[in-house]
Amino acid sequence: MIRIKRVYEKPSPDDGIRVLVERLWPRGVSKEKAAVDRWCKEIAPSPELRKWYSHDVSKWEEFKQRYLKELDGNQLVERLSALAARGDVTLIIAARDPERSSAAVLLGLLEHREGA
């Protein structure tokens, strides 16, 4: 199972492997508190895309399409997919709105691959 959790939420044994999917380390969070097993910053949206989106809800649909294009061919997608096939994976993010975050797009892609 793959899920999303904010880095500010308490880690849980149910999280399985915790993978930070942010390009920048979250402000004010120590490595101990984040308790991430892996940091895949190269799977996060490009700085240009992140800046363009700026969590503007009106740009959400276009952001998803642009980010999916960036993910196309990214080998980390395959690695995360393989990791999830072996057990629980939690995508860790700092974004305030997990449902409209890059992790939500990534989760959708990974779930689609699982079902394919």
Annotated model-derived regions:
Residues M1-A116:
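Residues lining hydrophobic/aromatic ligand-binding pockets adjacent to catalytic sites
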